[in-house]
Amino acid sequence: ENINYCAEKGIKVLGTSEHAPSMPGAPHYWYFGNLKVVPRVINGVTILKGCEANILDIEGSLDMSDEASKNLDYMIASFHEPVFKPRSREENTLAILNVMDKYDKVEILGHLGNPNYQLNYEAIIKKAKEKDIMIEINNSSLLGSSRIGSDVNCKKVALLCKEIGTKVILTSDAHINTCIGVFNKGIELLKEIQMPEELVMNDPEKLIAHLKSKGRLSDL
């Protein structure tokens, strides 16, 4: 359904990133292992096989082992309230910093603007640049349909990415096919702050080159 929608709309690359198993209602680990049988290109759409992994503790553990994630092209690391209850600013920040040190497959930090999690954005964004990790600009957060109150923080995050020179990626956080590729609020924000184009990783060739530089996508 998602692939056919992308083909109809002329979307060339689809990143699929289902929630990892600790999230209520998420698929079993075997779902992610089975992604190895999904062709790289279907109906002219290149498939990037990912996962939105849950941060479990301040040590930076994720609910995706090396074995479970070995067939993935990338992981998004995110906080979700049912899995990691918000803690102090220092503890929340430490958890994300530790994730970046522990998991090579983490390519994106998800919805940092969530106001329920106080964070030292500067420390996180500086380390993300050092590790060549992208910061998500989440359209759903900016719309206010999820993580209400994120918009102000999202702007702070985007401005720091611009200042520090950290890569960003616009995401739709689509939970239905008709929302795939909907970045309107994210685009508005990046235009408003005059984000340099070279930091925005949504161009298919640029994104694929980024992943290839990390040793991914050997079949492309």
Residue ranges and their predicted role:
Residues 1, 25-29, 118-126, 145-160, ...:
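Histidine/acidic-residue-rich catalytic or RNA/ligand-binding cores of hydrolases
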Residues 4-13:
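Active-site metal-binding motif and surrounding structural segment of the metallo-beta-lactamase
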Residues 7, 20, 24-137, 191-200, ...:
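Extended substrate/RNA-proximal surfaces in nucleic-acid metabolism proteins
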Residues 13-19:
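Ser/Thr-glycine-rich phosphate-binding loops at phosphate-binding pockets of nucleotides
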Residues 134-146:
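His/Asp/Glu-enriched short active-site or ligand-binding loop at hydrolase and phosphoryl-transfer sites
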Residues 166-180:
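Short acidic/histidine-rich active-site segments
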